[in-house]
Amino acid sequence: MSTEGGGRRCQAQVSRRISFSASHRLYSKFLSDEENLKLFGKCNNPNGHGHNYKVVVTVHGEIDPATGMVMNLADLKKYMEEAIMQPLDHKNLDMDVPYFADVVSTTENVAVYIWDNLQKVLPVGVLYKVKVYETDNNIVVYKGE
């Protein structure tokens, strides 16, 4: 099917991956020390532990006929640097990121935090999905729902 002169509007998704390192401790102030230890196990260590997180951010939208892009990947890289790397890389999530003062720093909540931060800097309506790899086997996908 030809797109020349047909006015066809094509939608696409574009993803970019980054990595950051951070430490945290899984602990809920709503649970006793015994309940925290039972629920979170070794991840409840009072000294915390760290991860090398991988994050895949997916945006979606119409492919611009003039540029051939949904979004310039250089721009997406800048947005991700501002919304993810600056606040999270080489940080203790529980101590250095105010959001986690009252929110348990599970990977689910890290994904929500990243989504919310990206929503502040990205053009309206383009963010589609945030995928956070805590490890190669532990992955959370969040779509703002």
UniProtKB/Swiss-Prot annotation:
The modification Phosphoserine is found at S19, S28. Changing N52S: In HPABH4A; severe form. Zn(2+) binds at H24, H49, H51. Its EC number is 4.2.3.12. Binds 1 zinc ion per subunit. Its cofactor is Zn(2+). Keywords: Disease variant, Lyase, Metal-binding, Phenylketonuria, Phosphoprotein, Tetrahydrobiopterin biosynthesis, Zinc. GO terms for cellular component: cytoplasm; cytosol; mitochondrion. GO terms for biological process: amino acid metabolic process; central nervous system development; tetrahydrobiopterin biosynthetic process. The active site is at C43 (proton acceptor), H90 (charge relay system), E134 (charge relay system). Gene3D superfamilies: 6-pyruvoyl tetrahydropterin synthase/QueD. Phosphorylation of Ser-19 is required for maximal enzyme activity. It catalyses: 7,8-dihydroneopterin 3'-triphosphate = 6-pyruvoyl-5,6,7,8-tetrahydropterin + triphosphate + H(+). Pathway: Cofactor biosynthesis; tetrahydrobiopterin biosynthesis; tetrahydrobiopterin from 7,8-dihydroneopterin triphosphate: step 1/3. One of its GO terms (molecular function) is identical protein binding. The modification Phosphotyrosine is found at Y128. The keyword Nuclease does not apply. It is linked to Hyperphenylalaninemia, BH4-deficient, A: An autosomal recessive disorder characterized by hyperphenylalaninemia, depletion of the neurotransmitters dopamine and serotonin, and progressive cognitive and motor deficits. Neurological symptoms are unresponsive to the classic phenylalanine-low diet. The active site is at the interface between 2 subunits. The proton acceptor Cys is on one subunit, and the charge relay system is on the other subunit. Homohexamer formed of two homotrimers in a head to head fashion. PANTHER family: 6-PYRUVOYL TETRAHYDROBIOPTERIN SYNTHASE, PYRUVOYL TETRAHYDROBIOPTERIN SYNTHASE. Involved in the biosynthesis of tetrahydrobiopterin, an essential cofactor of aromatic amino acid hydroxylases. Catalyzes the transformation of 7,8-dihydroneopterin triphosphate into 6-pyruvoyl tetrahydropterin. Belongs to the PTPS family. This is 6-pyruvoyl tetrahydrobiopterin synthase.
